[in-house]
């Protein structure tokens, strides 16, 4: 049983699984039933250092912590908020992007996208690939040159993080206001 628990911890964040197989008296995850789960994680979570909003994926800290406990509907709500932020910031920054070309480029790099991924999400994935290797800029469909990748990425990161933090602050203020009203109503009764 200890080996199963260890394997569960290793795969719980990245894999949804149904089944183990037994090999040489040990339980091992069966590759036949493994399905990679899709999360907004960008692989550089800053919430572990105390940030309220992750600098990588821009989820709120409680969303990062509880992601695997959320229902698909709750996860979709979060994805939509994140995609709306990408649409608001990135789409105007890349006015010459050819979406069909971008989609083909992203798929050719084996990046998985949700079926309902927004235009901004697709542009983000392409720009992220180019940020790692600016030589892909010309083939990306983003309508930018390789020397533009870094400045666009840096400005995008600055703007989208500011928007995500403002979104968090607004959500916190709303929750605080609702809390105060509930306390006031309870005191009146």
Write out the residue ranges for each language-model feature.
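Short flanking/linker segments adjacent to small metal-binding domains or redox-active Cys/His motifs
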Residues: 91-149
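Generic low-complexity, intrinsically disordered sequence content enriched
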Residues: 5, 86, 127, 174, ...
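Glutamate identity and glutamate-enriched acidic tracts
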Residues: 8-10, 25-26, 63, 73, ...
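C-terminal, charged low-complexity interaction regions
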Residues: 135-189
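Extended hydrophobic/Leu-rich segments
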Residues: 1-2, 6, 118, 182-185
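N-terminal cysteine/histidine-rich coordination modules
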Residues: 2-95
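Generic detector of well-ordered alpha-helical segments enriched in charged/polar residues
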Residues: 42, 76-83, 100-103, 107, ...
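Generic signature of intrinsically disordered, low-complexity segments enriched in small/polar residues
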Residues: 14, 20-23, 30, 70, ...
């Amino acid at each position: 049983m200890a080996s199963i628990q260890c394997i569960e911890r290793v795969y719980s964040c990245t894999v949804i699984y149904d089944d183990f197989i037994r090999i040489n008296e040990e339980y091992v995850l069966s590759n036949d039933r493994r399905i990679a789960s899709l999360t907004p994680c960008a692989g550089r979570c800053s919430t572990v250092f105390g940030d309220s909003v992750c600098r990588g994926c821009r989820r709120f800290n409680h969303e990062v912590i509880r992601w695997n406990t959320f229902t698909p509907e709750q996860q979709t709500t979060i994805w939509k908020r994140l995609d709306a932020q990408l649409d608001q910031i990135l789409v105007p920054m890349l006015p010459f992007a050819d979406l069909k070309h971008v989609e083909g480029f992203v798929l050719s790099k084996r990046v998985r996208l949700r079926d309902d991924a927004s235009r901004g999400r697709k542009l983000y994935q392409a720009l992220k690939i180019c940020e790692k290797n600016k030589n892909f800029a010309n083939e990306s469909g983003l309508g930018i040159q390789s020397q533009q990748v870094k400045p666009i990425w840096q400005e995008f990161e600055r703007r989208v993080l500011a928007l995500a933090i403002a979104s968090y602050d607004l959500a916190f203020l709303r929750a605080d206001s609702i809390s105060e009203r509930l306390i006031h109503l309870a005191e009146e009764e």
